[in-house]
A protein has these predicted regions:
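Polyanion-binding interface signature
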Residues: 1-81
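A charged, amphipathic interaction segment
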Residues: 56-128
Length: 128
């Protein structure tokens, strides 16, 4: 959900997302796989795919980097929780997946959550 939001908001607003069944031989020609084992844009070094996309596309917005840290905590095993929003984000995204009829609907619904998270973090950063 977060990766799709990041791609559409900050890389390619016209991006289309395909969901390939596990074990399928390969992604269609021209498709960039992400968030799957072995993909260039996936989990690396204890960081989530969102983090990999921010790094790969050289996105310098500090709020996006903060969201990457939040998702790292929500999406990967962490010994210590630093980002207080991580567990809430994880719970909300799980609920969206459970109540959505398919992955594309979940992406659309999740975009509102990530828009709201981004806006709240921007507002919070202005106070500092």
């Amino acid at each position: 959900m977060g990766c799709a939001w990041l791609i559409r908001k900050h890389i390619d607003p016209k991006a289309e997302f395909l969901f390939i069944p596990e074990g399928a031989p390969a992604a269609p020609k021209g498709a960039e796989p992400f968030d799957i084992p072995g993909a260039r844009l996936s989990h690396h070094g204890g960081h989530c795919s969102f983090h990999a996309i921010v790094r790969e596309y050289k996105l310098s917005d500090p709020i996006l980097k903060q969201i990457a840290r939040i998702i790292d905590e929500a999406d990967t095993v962490q010994e210590v929780q630093v980002e207080s929003a991580a567990s809430g984000l994880d719970l909300i995204c799980t609920g969206i997946r459970l109540t959505s009829p398919n992955d594309l609907v979940a992406i659309e619904r999740g975009a509102l959550v990530y828009d709201a998270l981004h806006a709240a973090l921007v507002k919070e950063s202005e106070k500092q």
